């Protein structure tokens, strides 16, 4: 009996061991064993602490190694983006001429940086703009900021003046016409060739307020890339003179063309040069006589002078700011979120694909009149600081 009891005890112990092994080593034991063996081989060459925990059979395969790796990569990207922002500051402050390829390489690097709106940066920059320029009160000429009897000096020809009499005064809105300010989402649409085949139209049209520059075409096939919604469009008086022949023979064509902008404001620099005044007033009279839906506004010369001084302190010293930079500056004051489309002063994409200067033609600006690379480096800085967002390529479509 004693030997029989010993045999039963031995059998019981073996069964217990077998049961424990089954509990200890589930069906994935072979794969886990390979992982453990690989871990033991790696341990001598600096295995991470997370991987060493695999030696505990009850510990699941950890994900901490990947998480740590991703955290490290994120930190590296953040540091590189900070360095890039510093480099942009240097780029805009230096006087030496940078090549187009230098800028394109910088933009390639910027695209690797995640973009997030930075509320504090935005508020600080907007406060500085408001302090110097005050678009809310002074962006356009109004009866409130320019009473009858004002002897208004021109923006560029500052020694020249125009007295504001009743007939001119009544062309002005009573106050600033942007009644829904601040707008949540604003799109400032430039005319760069980068917009061709961008498919940004739907995204642009979802914006609460859309700014456009210099009466660009927005109908037909162009609308899928540039959208059609327009709340404000600038008008360069030279367009009225050259394209529409001072609204004499081509008045009907002008009225037909601007009808595509719905009830948008038409913004003209009537008081930048004396030569602009008469033709700008003629646009106003033409729309009034034809009972058009669009309303004419005039840039306030004081606002433009102050804005030029603001950007001059940041290195933009060209003869005159581009319309795009003017409107982007206005948008920062009027809007909570600003996105720029079609701002691309380069002859090719970052993939080296040739581009036309505008999405509708290849007419180049006057040499030396604007300072596009300097302006663009400032816009890149605003992008990197989370103040506004630049669209560099095609838009994502649903």
UniProtKB/Swiss-Prot annotation:
Gene from which the chain derives: St8sia6
Catalysed reaction, written as an equation: a ganglioside GM3 + CMP-N-acetyl-beta-neuraminate = a ganglioside GD3 + CMP + H(+); a ganglioside GM3 (d18:1(4E)) + CMP-N-acetyl-beta-neuraminate = a ganglioside GD3 (d18:1(4E)) + CMP + H(+); a ganglioside GD1a (d18:1(4E)) + CMP-N-acetyl-beta-neuraminate = a ganglioside GT1a (d18:1(4E)) + CMP + H(+); a ganglioside GD1a + CMP-N-acetyl-beta-neuraminate = a ganglioside GT1a + CMP + H(+)
Keyword presence, Iron: no
Biological processes annotated in GO: blastocyst hatching; carbohydrate biosynthetic process; ganglioside biosynthetic process; glycolipid biosynthetic process; glycoprotein metabolic process; oligosaccharide metabolic process; protein O-linked glycosylation
InterPro entries the record matches: Glyco_trans_29, Glycosyltr_29_Sialyltrsf, GT29-like_sf, Sialyl_trans
Membrane topology: Single-pass type II membrane protein
Protein name as catalogued: Alpha-2,8-sialyltransferase 8F
Pathway: Protein modification; protein glycosylation
Compartments it resides in: Golgi apparatus membrane
